[in-house]
C-alpha cells in the first residue's frame, strides 16, 4: 500500500515543493482539505479532498472539516497491532503516515490591538491541533510537520534514509509538535486573560488561573551574564524586543539585552517615538551600565540630549548602552560616535545618521518601533527557584498633583521641575537609589547600596560642584535625617521621597533647619 500524507496548512510557504517530492519521488498519496487542496490541484498534483475521503462534507462554515474517525483513526492506529489493524479494515480506514499541519494564525491576528473578539475567536484552530496531537502521540508510526521551516530538513532526512522516516526524526518532530500546540494554547489563554471582558473578578476567581507564556526561540546567545553560563533568548515575534530590527553590529549578548531593557524603560519616561500609545514629549537620551542609568538628560534636540546625558558621567558611559526616544539625526549620530558604546536603540534613524554610524561597525544598532512596545503586555516576570514572580510593570505616569509639600518652604517652579525629572529617573535605579539632578540632567546617581545614605554619598560625590543648587530624589523614604543633612552639606536645595517613615519628622525638621524644600510623593519605587 502506498504511504499517505495529509496536508492542511494556513501558511502555504514551501507547500508545493514538499508535496511534489512526497508524491513524485516517494509515491505518497496526497490527502488535503479546503484551500490547501485547491493549491495542490492548481499545481497539477493528484489530491483527494478530505470530504471525499471521509464521505462527510465540511460543515458549520468550515469549522468542522477533519474531525472524523477516518482521519484520526488513520493517524492514531498502531501498525502491527492486530486489534487496530482489524478496526482499520472493518471501517475501511487508510493509515496516514505523514501529517503536515500548521495552525490558524491566532497570534498574528491578535497582534492587532483593535482586533474584535469575534475575529480572534474564529482564528482559534480546533481541527489542526487535534491532528497535530494525534500524530505526535503516534510518533512511532507517524511523522508530523507543523512549520514550513521543518520541510527542507525533513526531505533531507527522507533522502538520507532512502524514503523512510527514522524513529529519531519522528520523535524530534513529535517534541516540536507538542511544543507548537502548547505555545498556541498559551497564546490563546494569555490573550483572553488580558481582555477587559475577563479581568479578575473582585472575588479573585480569575487570578487562580495558571500564568502561561510560551515564547519561540529568537536566538541562542553566546553565553549568559558570564562565559561559563549558557543562554538563549525567547521572544514573541512582533512584541517588545521581538519586534526590534538590528541594523548593524555584532551579535547581541545577554548583558546587552538586559541593559537595553533598562535603558528603554528609563527613556520611555519621556515618551517614545511617534504613533504609539505614549509618543515622545521632549527629546531625551539615557546611558546605562550594568542595568543602572549613569547619565540621563532632556533637551531641545536629541544631539543636545545625548551630549548632556554623556556629560552626566563620561567615565561610566564608556562601553555603555544608549537609548534615544526619537529619530536619530546626523548631529545625534555624530555625538554617538564620540566614544565607545556597545548598543544604541531608537525608534528610527535618518539615512544620513545610518551612514555616520556605519563607521562604528561593531556598534549594535537597534530600531524598535513604538508599536512593538505597545504589543508587549504589562507583566514584569522574574524567575525564582522552581517558579516565577509576576507583577505589574512599575510604569504608571508621574502624578505630581498628588504630591505634598512637607517643609516650611515650598519648592520654586524650577526646583519642582527638577524634582519631577529626578523622580522619573530614580525608579529605574537599583535600590537603595538616589538621583541628583538639575535643569533636566542627571548629575550623580547612587545605586544598589545597602543603606540609603551610602547611595546618597555616591551620588553627591559624583555630582561634585554641580550639586550646589541641584535637587535630590530617593526611591524610598528617609529612615533618618542623615541623608538630608548630607545633601545640604553639598548644596542641595530640595528633596523628594515617598515618605512614610516613623522618623519622617526628623528629616522634615532638618529640611526646615537647613532651608531645604521637601516633597512627599506617597509612592515607593524599589527596584531589585
Curated annotation (Swiss-Prot):
GO terms for biological process: 'de novo' IMP biosynthetic process. It holds the Pfam family MGS. SMART domains: AICARFT_IMPCHas, MGS. The keyword Transferase applies. Pathway: Purine metabolism; IMP biosynthesis via de novo pathway; 5-formamido-1-(5-phospho-D-ribosyl)imidazole-4-carboxamide from 5-amino-1-(5-phospho-D-ribosyl)imidazole-4-carboxamide (10-formyl THF route): step 1/1; Purine metabolism; IMP biosynthesis via de novo pathway; IMP from 5-formamido-1-(5-phospho-D-ribosyl)imidazole-4-carboxamide: step 1/1. Keywords: Hydrolase, Multifunctional enzyme, Purine biosynthesis, Transferase. Its EC number is 2.1.2.3, 3.5.4.10. One of its GO terms (molecular function) is IMP cyclohydrolase activity. GO terms for cellular component: cytosol. The IMP cyclohydrolase activity resides in the N-terminal region. This is Bifunctional purine biosynthesis protein PurH. It comes from Synechococcus sp. (strain WH7803).
Amino acid at each position: 500500500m502506498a504511504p499517505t500524507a495529509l496536508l492542511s496548512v494556513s501558511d502555504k510557504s514551501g507547500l508545493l515543493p514538499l508535496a511534489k517530492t512526497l508524491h513524485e519521488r516517494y509515491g505518497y498519496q496526497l490527502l488535503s482539505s479546503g484551500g490547501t487542496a485547491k493549491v495542490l490541484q492548481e499545481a497539477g498534483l493528484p489530491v483527494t479532498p478530505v470530504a471525499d475521503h471521509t464521505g462527510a462534507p465540511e460543515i458549520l462554515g468550515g469549522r468542522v472539516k477533519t474531525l472524523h474517525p477516518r482521519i484520526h483513526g488513520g493517524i492514531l492506529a498502531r501498525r502491527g497491532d492486530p486489534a487496530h489493524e482489524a478496526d482499520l479494515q472493518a471501517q475501511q480506514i487508510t493509515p496516514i503516515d505523514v501529517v503536515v499541519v500548521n495552525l490558524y494564525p491566532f497570534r498574528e491576528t491578535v497582534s492587532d490591538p483593535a482586533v474584535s473578539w469575534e475575529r480572534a475567536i474564529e482564528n482559534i484552530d480546533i481541527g489542526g491541533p487535534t491532528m497535530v496531537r494525534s500524530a505526535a502521540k503516534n510518533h512511532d508510526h507517524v511523522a508530523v510537520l507543523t512549520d514550513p521551516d521543518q520541510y527542507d530538513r525533513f526531505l533531507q532526512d527522507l533522502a538520507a534514509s532512502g524514503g523512510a522516516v527514522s524513529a529519531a526524526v519522528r520523535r524530534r518532530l513529535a517534541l516540536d509538535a507538542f511544543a507548537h500546540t502548547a505555545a498556541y494554547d498559551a497564546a490563546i489563554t494569555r490573550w483572553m486573560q488580558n481582555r477587559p471582558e475577563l479581568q479578575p473578578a473582585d472575588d479573585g476567581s480569575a487570578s487562580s488561573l495558571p500564568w502561561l507564556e510560551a515564547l519561540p526561540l529568537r536566538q541562542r546567545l553566546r553565553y549568559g551574564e558570564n562565559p561559563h553560563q549558557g543562554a538563549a533568548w525567547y521572544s514573541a515575534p512582533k512584541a517588545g524586543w521581538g519586534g526590534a530590527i538590528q541594523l548593524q553590529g555584532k551579535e547581541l549578548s545577554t548583558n546587552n539585552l538586559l541593559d537595553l531593557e533598562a535603558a528603554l524603560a528609563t527613556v520611555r519616561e519621556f515618551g517614545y517615538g511617534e504613533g504609539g500609545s505614549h509618543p515622545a514629549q521632549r527629546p531625551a537620551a539615557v546611558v546605562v551600565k550594568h542595568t543602572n542609568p549613569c547619565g540621563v538628560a532632556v533637551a531641545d534636540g536629541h544631539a543636545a540630549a545625548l551630549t548632556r546625558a554623556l556629560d552626566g558621567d563620561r567615565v561610566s558611559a564608556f562601553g555603555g548602552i544608549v537609548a534615544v526616544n526619537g529619530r536619530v539625526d546626523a548631529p545625534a549620530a555624530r555625538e554617538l560616535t564620540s566614544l565607545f558604546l556597545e548598543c544604541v536603540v531608537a525608534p528610527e534613524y535618518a539615512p544620513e545618521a545610518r551612514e555616520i554610524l556605519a563607521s562604528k561597525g561593531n556598534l549594535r544598532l537597534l530600531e524598535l518601533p513604538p508599536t512593538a512596545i505597545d504589543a508587549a503586555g504589562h507583566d514584569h516576570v522574574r524567575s525564582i527557584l522552581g517558579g516565577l514572580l509576576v507583577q505589574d510593570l512599575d510604569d504608571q505616569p508621574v502624578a505630581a498633583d498628588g504630591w505634598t509639600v512637607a517643609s516650611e518652604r515650598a519648592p520654586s517652579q524650577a526646583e519642582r521641575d527638577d524634582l519631577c525629572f529626578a523622580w522619573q529617573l530614580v525608579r529605574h535605579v537599583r535600590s537603595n537609589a538616589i538621583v541628583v539632578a538639575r535643569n533636566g540632567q542627571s548629575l550623580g546617581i547612587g545605586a544598589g547600596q545597602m543603606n540609603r545614605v551610602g547611595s546618597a554619598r555616591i551620588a553627591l560625590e559624583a555630582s561634585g560642584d554641580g550639586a550646589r543648587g541641584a535637587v535630590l530624589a530617593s526611591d524610598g523614604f528617609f529612615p533618618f535625617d542623615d541623608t538630608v543633612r548630607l545633601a545640604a552639606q553639598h548644596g542641595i536645595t530640595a528633596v523628594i521621597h515617598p515618605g512614610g517613615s516613623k522618623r519622617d519628622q526628623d528629616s522634615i525638621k532638618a529640611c526646615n533647619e537647613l532651608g531645604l524644600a521637601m516633597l512627599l510623593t506617597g509612592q515607593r519605587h524599589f527596584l531589585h
